[in-house]
């Protein structure tokens, strides 16, 4: 019985993610397009907060350090995700094959400053939590 519920839940999450695939990619491209070097994270933080609100997070706020805190759902279990959204600089722009803030998609991969470290995990966390909180 538990195994079936897990399979059903996994199928529902997969369906939610497939439905929102374009939104997830757009969101990732948008946050990677916002420069956030040297801990200048306010603009990208506001964009992330807006996405959380759009997805139904009941509480979205910033603490005094600039961290984005959000709450979605009201079940008995609590999940905490953590990431950083600042990046290192781009160095010499002439050394890049493309605009590092463009969010270039090629062969199924997104290339942009911060895509791997660490802005890229943020859409998965936010949409994953929204999927888990979604009613079947």
Language-model-detected regions and their locations in the chain:
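Acidic/histidine-rich catalytic neighborhood of metal-dependent amide-processing enzymes
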Residues: 118-136
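Acidic/His- and Gly-rich active-site-bordering loop/insert found
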Residues: 2-115, 132-136
């Amino acid at each position: 019985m538990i195994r079936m519920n897990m399979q059903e839940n996994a199928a529902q999450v997969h369906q939610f993610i497939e439905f929102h695939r374009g939104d997830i990619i757009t969101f990732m491209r948008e946050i990677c397009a916002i420069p956030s070097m040297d801990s200048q994270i306010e603009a990208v933080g506001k964009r992330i907060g807006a996405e959380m609100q759009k997805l139904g997070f009941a509480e979205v706020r910033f603490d005094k350090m600039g961290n984005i805190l959000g709450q979605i759902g009201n079940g008995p279990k609590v999940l905490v995700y953590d990431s950083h959204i600042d990046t290192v600089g781009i160095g010499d722009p002439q050394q890049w094959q493309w605009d590092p803030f463009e969010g270039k998609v090629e062969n199924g991969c997104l290339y942009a400053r911060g895509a791997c470290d660490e802005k890229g995990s943020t859409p998965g966390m936010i949409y994953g939590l929204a999927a888990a909180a979604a009613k079947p």
